[in-house]
Amino acid sequence: AMEMKPLNWKPEPGIGYTVTRRSDGGMHYTFTDASPATLAHWREFAFQHLYDSDRLTRNLYDLRQLSALSETAIMIALEANSDPAARNIRVAVVVGNEKTRAAIQQIADLTAPGGVEMGIFMDMESAETWLDRPLTILT
């Protein structure tokens, strides 16, 4: 079994997301809000973890509790997706409504080719199935 890196994350009051390590070594994020404080915390955490991803990583974002995403959230996600270190990442995003889905689609459309591979889903099962597909190495 591969060794799991410890997750350098601790819950803080007022931060509207949690993250756990997936069995495949990726991360499972659950957002309850997308406030500026939450976004700032997530951005810092996400960038910290980009740099230690030396192999393909599968991340899951559960955004079903969010009713919409702000422009700020979209910009930060794009910034993370466009980082050269993000090319090794496959991200499944589970959304609960059309508004959030459209925002995530916008992020996917604006992400440069060769960046993060993104999939958008309405249920966890489809997201997991997609994440589990064999990884294609993008050059």
For the regions a protein language model found, what residue spans apply to each?
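Amphipathic, Lys/Arg-enriched alpha-helical "gate/interface" segment within cytosolic domains
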Residues: 2-139
